[in-house]
Amino acid sequence: SKGGNNYMLETFLNVVPITIIAGIIYVIYRIIKIKKNKLSVNYFYEIVKFIFVCYLTGLINLVLVPSNLWSHFWFYVKNGYSTGDSLGWFSGSFNFVPSLYKYLIKGELSIGTWIRDMLIGNMLMFIPMGIMLPLVFKNINKKNIFVIAILITLSIEILQPIVGRSFDIDDIIMNFIGSIIGYLAVTIFIKLKETNK
């Protein structure tokens, strides 16, 4: 729906400033560390780590802070007073029924809603995780990627009800699938690149 799309866009835009700030802080930290310790610089690796820091910052703000926190914050910055609305701590919900079941069996969801919420809202959001984990942590293997992916997803879902969001079985499934797709994509790309050398 148009309202749902506007909400997703607004939520994304609200976390952009804090993500940029985190990126700037990380760059300053790396420059100081490299100069102080006279380290050699692998620019590709540094860029990947920078993107990973920005991605994690954005991800954490999208899924592990109250959904209206940043809109409240920017409202206060702009107007000098609070909206007075609650942030909704400990008001989260729980869903243990996959939405695909609701769509296929009960007909409660439209295919458009399912694609937007599940594929775009969940799976695509975690594909970068699967891509960047093996690039940032070079010695990580397939088994550890699977373990890390499921642990990150479970941790997020367990914490979400605390910040007024929902524990959702769909999120666990789609986030995990997104991470694995990202990992497989980067693995295939690396192997093809090595083959063509």
Where are these regions (language model features)?
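Bulky hydrophobic segments
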Residues: K2-G164, L184-K197
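Loop-to-transmembrane alpha-helix initiation sites
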Residues: F167, I172-I173
